[in-house]
Structures are given as C-alpha cells and as structure tokens.
A protein has these predicted regions:
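Hydrophobic alpha-helical membrane-insertion segments
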Residues: 47-63, 187-200, 394-402, 493-516, ...
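Alpha-helical transmembrane segments and their helix-start/interface "positive-inside/aromatic belt" motifs
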Residues: 36-51, 178-190, 385-395, 450, ...
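Transmembrane helix-loop junctions and nearby membrane-interface residues
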Residues: 25, 29, 56-67, 107, ...
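Membrane-interfacial helical/loop segments at transmembrane boundaries in membrane proteins
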Residues: 69-84, 206-222, 412-423, 511-544
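Transmembrane helix-loop-helix hairpins at membrane boundaries of multipass inner-membrane proteins
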Residues: 1-11, 15, 27-128, 201-225, ...
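Membrane-entry segments of alpha-helical transmembrane domains in multi-pass membrane proteins
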Residues: 2-16, 36-47, 83-101, 139-152, ...
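Hydrophobic transmembrane alpha-helices and their helix-loop junctions in integral membrane proteins
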Residues: 108-152, 158-480, 506
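Aromatic-capped, Gly/Pro-kinked transmembrane alpha-helices
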Residues: 82, 87-90, 510-556, 566-674
Length: 674
C-alpha cells in the first residue's frame, strides 16, 4: 500500500545543510565577525549533512519497502500568463536513491575535510561551500518542476566556481574556475532553450503535467521545417547535460577542476554537479523516448567521451588528473546507457560510481598528504608499506572501477555493455566497440596509477621537485621525506566508502534494474527500445551474473589491461619510454588533449575577442559614435551655421526669402492642380 511522506521531513533534507552552510559561512568567517571557531563550524556543517542523510535513508526505506511517494507543490512563487512558477518536491525511487548518495558521500567528504584542510586559512569558508554545494544538489534532485531544477542546476555551477577557485591567490585556480563557469554557460544556453520550448508548447514547467502532454508534443514540428519539436527539445536539454556532466566537446573544464582542494574534487566527481546531467536526462526519459534521433545523438556523444577521454588518462602523471579522466570516461558510459534507453542502468552506474570514485579521490588526497604534497606518480612507488589503509582501500576502489566480478562497478558497467549490445539504434555498433575498448583502457590506466604509487621501487627521494609543493598544497609542511599514513579522520571515510564500493552492486542490482524500483520515475517504450527487457531475460541473479562475467569479453579485456600495466611498469619499466619515442606523434596529440584547449583559446576565445574588437571599433566607435552620435551633432551644427547666415538683419535679405517662399508655394499649388 502506497504511503505519503512528510513534507516537513523532506524540507529538512536540503535545509539542514543550508543552515550549516550559513552558520559556517557567516558566523565562522570575517564576514560575520568570526563568532564561531573551526570546531563549531565543522560540527554544525557535519550535523546538518548527517541530519539530511538520516532523513534520506528513512525516505529510501519508505519508498523501497512501503511504496511511499510524494509529489506536491510547497510554494507558488508567481503565476505569469498561466505559467506557474513553483517550489515543490517529487520523491520517488530515483529521487530517494540520489538523496542517499548525495548526502552519504557529502558526509564522508565533510569528515575527511577535517583532516585534509586542518591548516588551511579558509577552513570555515570551505565547510560553508561544501554544505552549500550539498544543499544545491539536493534541491536539484528533489524538484518536481523544471524551474526549481534550473535553479539547483545553476546553484551547483556557482558553488563549483567558488570551490574550484577556492585558493583564489593561485592564477591557475582562478583560470580553472572561470573556465568551468564559461563552458557550463555554453551548455546552460541549450538547457534554457529546452526548458523554454517545453514551457512554450506544453504551457507548464511541472514534470507530471509536461510528461502528460508528451504524445501531443511528439506530433508537433517547427513551422517550415521537418524538425520534430521533441527532438529539438531533447537535444537542447542534452546540451545542458553535456556541459554539466562534461561530455565531449564540453568536457574541457573537468580536468582543470583539480585545481580545487581534493575533497571538493571527490564531491564534484562522485555525487554532485557532474551527475546532475545524467540525472536530468533520466528524469526526462518520457521525452527522450519519443526521439530516436536524440537517443542516438546521446549514445554517440557518450561513446566518444568514454573511449577518447580514457586515452588521456594513460599519459597523466598527476595522481588527481588520472582519476579525473577516469570520471570523464565513466560519465561517458552512463551517457551511452541513457542513449540505449537503459536509464535505470545509467543511474545504477551513477550510484556505484559515486562510491568508488569518491573513494579513489579521497585516497589520492590521502596519498598527497602522506607524500607531503607530491602529486607526481613518477616520484612515488613503494607507498604500500607506509600507508596500509590507503593502499588497501585504493586497491578495492580500483577493482571496482575496472569492473571486477562481484565488485560494485562490475554489475553496473557490464549491464551498460550488455544494454548497448542489445540496442538497435543508429550508432549502437560504434558505442558497443567504444565501451568494450574502454574497459581495456580503464584497467590499464587504473593499474598504471596503482603500481606506480603503491608498488615497485621507492622513488620519492629522487623527486627533483621534492622541496616544492604540488598545486593541492594547503598549508601542511612535512619535515620528513618518508611517506606516512593519514590520520583516522581521513582514513575512516576511506573505509566507509570502500564497503559499498564492494557490496552495493551485488545487493541492489536486482531490485533497482529488474524489481521495478524506478518504475514510477523512468519510462521506457519497450516495443521500440527493448534493451532493458533483453537484459531482464538474461539476468539470473547477481551471483550467476558474476560467474558468467568471468567468461565474458569485458573481464578478459580488463584483465589484459591490468596485466599489461603490471608488465610495463613493474617488470619492464623501460618499455613505456621506448613506446613513447616510437609513437611520439600520438603522445603529442594526447599530451595536448586533442588540442581542444588550444582550439578554444586560440580560435574561439581569440576569434571572439577579434570579432568584439572589430564590432567595437567599426560598429561602436565609427558607426554609432562616429556617424550617429557625433555625426548628428555635426549635421545640426552645419545646418545651424547655414541658417544663421540667413539671419543677417538686412531687410532686402528677408524680402528675397519671402519672394523665394512665395515662388515655391505657387509652384507647388500649380503642380497640385495641373
């Protein structure tokens, strides 16, 4: 029997982190007089997120077991021309899952931050930002209308700007946060157009009301064109997702977001911001199901991102950037699943990925602490014996990432690969190849990172930059060069994230994908897009799936990539340099990130500046100021000078003027009566 959730309890979920953010951001900083210290600041923000997590967990239980649902408007902001602008919550299986993921990962990041940022001058400000980030994401996922979705969408973009540029005295951080902000504005332009078209043609911003008119929208085309309205709407919405979820070619901001502190890298990449685009497309599934063109576009973009962003992870030497490029690749996998109409598989991978990606980022931060802020993996090695907790949790996260059977990533990633294999849409063949090849690439760069950091010869004493801190330096200064394990406040979140990274897939795949957990939230036309039905026929339980996975191509591709990484970096460490020399053009292409940054900076940015300069000098200075503004007063001055000469004071001049006037009038009347 379906039950109704409490509006007051749901309202407390986003408001509790907001209250903590306001307390730390106002009372804990110079803005509010520093009334509260560090301990109270982090205690209040952690308490707020803890309250949100507890209520979210209770909500998930009510939704999953008791069948509870909630879809109500809490406040009507305004009504303009029949278009209602409201604040409300929609809580179903998709929302409840996202609420738990966001709040749990955020809670782990908050606790971790106590140890990681302990000596940073902006300690209280950072806690305020990450709590505000959590509030923004919760408002986004809990919304029941597109206006509130958009406000949450923009809020996570704004707070990510503040967090990426948290160390605002660093030029690279300021460049990175501006880059993220501008690239996301490109995507948001498409997002706004999509929402605007829905509002214009459906007459509503409410999800349920708009989806009820989906069939009507599917029959509309733009006047004078053969373009289906729903296709244009879906592509516009997906352009927004391309920016927020860093899909090709709007992916360029995400690697540079590593300029922010490691805790926020984990939060952005695991549970907030980049997952917003995936969530939004899944939420809009009733619209996307009406356009095969849009779905194919989504699938191909995701496939390109999954494979080609993975290649870039192979050559990275910064420990955080390797993990960042793995995020880009995994987001591509989720996007491919969306394009195959396997929306539930996409959000399932979103959930599993959130745990092991947060784990890998926080483990990377732990290594950075232990290595006294050396982030170059070429100058690590042998760290396992110095940092046992970080080592074992990193290994578990890596095994989950590459899709090892029984680990969380296996169940979601293999489901994506099977869904694409069963898809009949245009582009599915390329996407299937891309996600299969991506398995090998992911395993290779993941274990390259693992072996270079935790195994092999100790190289940290050979680091030529040993006395200089990496870009994630926030005030810690190690006097000894030997690595050391991080404090418990850092390692406990690693352990707590490692647990779901191992077991969450086995525990939840059946109810989430085949038990109807998302039945009220996600719509799939199984007659046109039967991939999920085919997966259901093939599924015989998580244990059987793991056994079958041992014989499937993804497992052997992952094993091959792992073994190759072991051979190249443990057995024959001279081989990578030889391969680099042999394929220098390929390395140069990858090292320059396919020249996207060069193109954006030298063609788009410089071209825009040149166009702006030309319009300024030619249009503004010469045409507007020169011809219109200055030209008008010059013309008036010239006419005034001519007229002034006629006012001479001589009577015969005025008589002459009168005669000319009479002659002109007579001529006019004669012509008029001819």
């Amino acid at each position: 029997m379906s039950q109704t959730l409490s509006a007051s309890a749901l309202l407390a979920v986003p408001l509790a982190p907001l209250a903590g953010a306001l307390a730390a951001g106002i009372l804990g900083t110079s803005f509010g007089g520093n009334w509260i210290g560090r301990r109270l600041s982090h205690s209040l923000t952690i308490l707020g997120v803890l309250v949100a997590f507890i209520i979210s967990a209770m909500t998930l239980k009510s939704v999953a077991i008791d069948g509870a649902r909630f879809n109500e408007t809490l406040y009507t902001w305004m009504n303009v021309g029949g278009l209602k602008m409201e604040i409300g919550f929609l809580v179903d299986g998709l929302t409840a899952m996202m609420m738990c993921v966001v709040t749990f990962v955020s809670l782990m990041v908050h606790i971790y931050t106590i140890g990681y940022m302990e000596e940073d001058e902006g300690y209280n400000r950072f806690f305020a930002y990450i709590s505000l980030f959590t509030f923004s994401m919760l408002m986004l996922v809990m919304s029941n209308n597109m206006l509130q979705l958009f406000f949450g969408w923009e809020a996570v973009g704004l707070v990510s700007y503040l967090l990426i540029g948290f160390w605002f005295n660093k030029p690279t951080a300021i460049f990175a946060n501006m880059k993220a902000f501008l690239v996301n504005r490109v995507g948001d332009f498409g997002f706004i157009l999509g929402i605007g078209l829905i509002a214009a043609y459906a007459g509503t911003l409410n999800y349920a009301e708009a989806f009820a008119k989906a069939d009507e929208l599917s029959r509309l085309t733009f006047p004078g064109t053969g373009w289906m309205l729903v296709t244009v709407v879906c592509i516009c919405l997906f352009i927004g997702a391309m920016g927020k979820s860093a899909q090709f070619p709007l992916h360029v901001w995400l690697p540079d977001s590593m300029e922010g502190p490691t805790p926020i890298s984990a939060l952005i990449h695991a549970a907030t911001m980049v997952t917003a685009g995936i969530f939004m497309v899944a939420r809009m599934s009733p619209l996307f199901e009406l356009s095969d063109t849009a779905l194919s576009f989504v699938m191909v973009i995701g496939a390109i991102t999954a494979l080609f962003m993975g290649f870039l992870g192979i050559i990275q030497n910064d420990i955080k950037r390797v993990v960042a490029y793995s995020t880009l690749s995994q987001l591509g996998y989720m996007t491919v699943a969306l394009g195959a109409s396997a929306y539930s598989v996409a959000v399932f991978h979103l959930m599993t990925h959130a745990f092991f990606k947060a784990l890998l980022f926080l483990a990377a931060g732990s290594v950075i602490i232990g290595m006294h802020h050396n982030q170059d993996i070429r100058w690590m090695g042998g760290v396992r014996k110095y940092m046992p907790v970080t080592w074992i949790t990193s290994l578990l996260g890596t095994l989950a990432l590459i899709g090892t059977p029984l680990f969380a990533g296996f169940y979601s990633k293999d489901s994506i690969i099977e869904a694409v294999h069963e898809s009949h849409l245009a582009g599915a063949g390329f996407a299937y190849f891309a996600v299969l090849a991506g398995v090998f690439v992911t395993a290779f760069y993941s274990f390259r990172l693992y072996f270079l950091v935790f195994h092999g010869k100790e190289r940290f004493d050979q680091n030529p930059d040993a006395h200089h801190h990496g870009h994630d330096d926030h005030g810690h200064h190690g006097e000894h060069h030997a690595p050391h394990e991080s404090p418990w406040v850092v390692t406990v979140p690693l352990i707590l994230l490692a647990i779901p990274s191992v077991v969450i897939g086995f525990m939840t795949i059946e109810p989430m994908l085949y038990g109807g957990f998302f039945k009220d939230a996600i719509f799939v036309n199984l007659e046109k897009h039967p991939a999920m039905e085919e997966l259901k026929q093939l599924f015989h339980g998580p244990a059987q799936m793991a056994l079958h996975g041992l014989m499937a191509p993804p497992f052997w591709l992952a094993l091959s990539g792992s073994v190759l990484a072991w051979y190249m970096y443990m057995v024959n460490p001279a081989l990578p340099a030889a391969i680099k020399r042999m394929f220098m053009p390929v390395f140069t292409l990858l090292d320059n990130k396919y020249y996207f940054d060069w193109f954006n900076e030298n063609v788009l940015a410089r071209g825009t500046r040149l166009l702006g300069t030309a319009l300024w000098k030619g249009g503004d200075q010469k045409l507007i100021d020169g011809a219109l503004v200055n030209g008008s007063w010059k013309l008036v001055g010239w006419v005034s000078g001519v007229v002034r000469r006629l006012q001479s004071g001589y009577i015969y001049h005025y008589a002459f003027g009168m005669i000319v006037g009479v002659f002109v009038l007579m001529t006019y009347f004669v012509w008029l009566n001819r």
